[in-house]
Amino acid sequence: MRDEIKNLTIEAVIDKLSQKKFSAVELVKSCLKNIKEKESVLAAFLSVDEKLALQQAEIADQQIEQLTKDNLPELIGVPIAIKDNILVEGMPCTAGSKILKNYIAPYNATVIKKLSQAGAIIIGKTNLDEFAMGSSTENSAFQTTKNPIDLERVPGGSSGGSAAAVAGGEVICALGSETGGSIRQPASFCGIVGLKPTYGSVSRFGLIAFASSIDQIGPLTKTVSGAKRIFRAIRGIDSNDSTTKVFPENNKKTLSLKEIRVGIPREYFTGEVDKRVASLVKKVISQLEKEKVKMIEVSLPHTKYALPAYYIIAPSEASANLARYDGIRYGCPAKAETLSDLYFVRNLFIVGWIL
């Protein structure tokens, strides 16, 4: 089973569990063995709670015995990893920073409560760029996560630990958070599916904030249908998050390709786009046209302002959100013998951040 985990989807797990092909306990033990075997190379996890995972698996097996398949919770027995900026009661939550190295979450984030209600099994907490600020997971204060497809490459970030854990066959799926690409970019780098939900559709209560007006929690999975299943489980209004709202239900299970309209923004195919990327996107457009999908050229003239706006909003909100940690603990000293050396090291960090 350990070799199967890399290719097991959420739907396959639920089917096999309900058919008694294997138990939730067996599945979790296989995940834990894979983590022990692969972590020395991948470094996707910051903490793993074997005892909690096995307890949850036993509960899942009991429910599977007692309930019919149609009455089982939506994510029954599915092992999931959680980005380490989302609070899970009793587990460490570091946000990839030594400032929070010994912080233990005193309560569950709303998404964790909802995952538990849906029957998911929490395996552990995944690595991230410090306070979710980064795009490579090289900026974690603890370790550098590798891309399981190519160990010489980064997994993306800041949810790189979650993406690597799923793509590397350590867990079936994971939660990440996104402000400016932190779910979708690592999902792309690792060859899996990432969804940043519409702002307000998923509660941020229990998420260590980066930029509050942009942050969202979302799934990283192997299939689109798996992402949909997790999104269905975690979405909804929350009295603890005033930005959440009720969105209209889309009860239609599937759409005919002929019913779909896809916009092609002309501004996205400028000379700045990598030729290989543009070529692949154009191939997809051709394939969709062959399937009778309606392709419509649109204009998004304000797109060019998106990045400058992001770099005004995100640092401003981050400085306010992270001010609460100021003075909690002294930072790690740089290795420098003189003040000039210290200035040099500091300037290297600043230049690297700007680039």
Model-predicted regions and their roles:
Residues 31, 53, 108, 227, ...:
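Residue-level signal for inorganic ion chemistry
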Residues 53-55, 70-142:
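Acidic/His- and Gly-rich active-site-bordering loop/insert found
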Residues 24, 28-29, 58-61, 273-299, ...:
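Acyltransferase
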Residues 196-279, 284, 340-346:
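A short helix-breaking turn/cap at a secondary-structure junction
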Residues 108-234:
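Short glycine/serine-rich loop segments
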Residues 75-95, 256-265, 316-355:
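Short helix-loop capping/hinge segments that flank enzyme active sites or metal/cofactor-binding pockets
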Residues 1-52, 290-292:
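An N-terminal boundary/leader segment
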Residues 59-74, 250-258, 350:
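Short, basic, low-complexity termini and linkers enriched in Ser/Thr/Gly/Pro
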